[in-house]
């Protein structure tokens, strides 16, 4: 009776603050609607004990309860995330889960490899269900806004290669190469001699297969290797969706390594997710806690100001910064749509628990980018102190239609 009274009081409090298209189904068969609008989301509490997740509805608590099967939720992922954020926002105190907590973790080669395998080595077939055919698992670039996911991913890669002014025959290092889409494109379109490194065994195996199938083994070397173990120098370096795994304390060293690997007249691009909190705090309402526990162990997001500062500490000069937050919101929304459309195929590949984790994660990311809780920046940089005569004077070259040479045929 005590819990029931608490729940009744909580429902009254929420109703007094906002009208949500939410239905709560109780363990005794009764239900309560939180507005006169037809419910778009239903949360079922199977037991009296499960009411505690609503009484303290941080995203970590609600997400964990859904993943572990302690509550059931019906509705689209986008509606679920929006309503759960509203519950948290109207219940939690600012000094509690509402706060943007800063987390710091110990990073070394073994721990980083373990974290990467946890996230990326689900199965290639799993990722094939919701990514584009090239398996590009990073923010797409919607130049006009009406592109398909596949078109936008190709445009993203081309946008990057134009920004770094890749020239025919140059050497390129891609840190965190995924399934090889960027290095394959660079070799096909520019004849670039590429090295791609990843810590994911599944990515490594499939990327090598794709390189061989494209007839590009003479131009592309895919390695199962930590970026800290790479030697030599490269004309161009790209890092797309990787530096989030580096750790806040290690960013100066990360950029120092890029500086060391970059040729004197080289150019690099870092494309990564950032915190929108000036103090490098994680997403609010317990969202960051859920991501750390279930999705990205030891992931840390830096504010763009901190990224620029640590780049300079690493001996790099920033030439260009572009915010692609809205592009990632759309990318994640399309991934979520694909995920839900292929739910029947994904469940047996991932299992129910992992299916629920990713269902929440993808939609939650779309919401977080849309609400400016996190962001995405592409940063072009060079070794500090380059002579002006060796650098572009404007951004015009990035958008020139003839910026990319004719395709290079494999031989």
Protein language model annotation of sequence segments:
Residues 265-273:
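Conserved beta-strand signature within the Rossmann-like core of class I S-adenosyl-L-methionine
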Residues 1-153, 159:
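Feature captures hydrophobic
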Residues 273-389:
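Substrate-binding/catalytic lobe of Class I Rossmann-like enzymes that use SAM or dcSAM, i.e.
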Residues 179-190:
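Conserved SAM-binding loop of SAM-dependent methyltransferases across substrates and taxa
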Residues 252-264:
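A short glycine-rich, Lys/Arg-flanked "PGG" loop and its adjoining helix->strand segment in the class I
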